[in-house]
Amino acid sequence: MTDKEVLSQEAAAAKNFNEFFRQWWFSVSVMLLICLTTLLPDHIIQQLALIHAPISHGEIWRLVTSQFVHLGFNHTLLNLVGYLIVAASFREDITPREETIALGFSVIGVGLGIYWFNPDIAWYVGLSGAIYGILTHYLIVG
């Protein structure tokens, strides 16, 4: 193999990586955030979970943070796989910007929906609801 062929292959690999990164940076960032929050101690996860009483007393961040923490490894893995499947299914049709907007609206919608319409749910964590919101967005828009 000549030097020119090696350089050509390296350029193609760099282009492929740049294209991958351009399309996947947001999804990968979300998945890394979820993995990192799994390492948090239980008392911190409790501070981030959606619990009605603290939200009623002003801890509104819980409406969003609750969806990025999980009950353990299995719960995290299931949500990561679900998010990956949905993201991969529509990768060619949706930009990272559109994914960011869809996830933002889904997270806020799920948090407010549980808080306002499901007061019987005492404690909520996980990204499942937002994944369904993103899937719905992709099916409507894509």
What does each model-found stretch correspond to?
Residues 47-49, 67-74, 93-101:
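Short, amphipathic, aromatic/basic-enriched membrane-interface segments that mark the entry/exit
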Residues 26-41, 82-137:
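Small-polar-interrupted transmembrane alpha-helices in polytopic inner-membrane proteins
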Residues 140-142:
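Metallo-beta-lactamase
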Residues 19-22, 67-73, 117, 121:
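Membrane-interfacial loop-to-transmembrane-helix junctions in polytopic alpha-helical membrane proteins
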Residues 1-61:
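N-terminal signal-anchor transmembrane helix
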Residues 59-80:
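Interfacial helix-start motif at the membrane-water boundary
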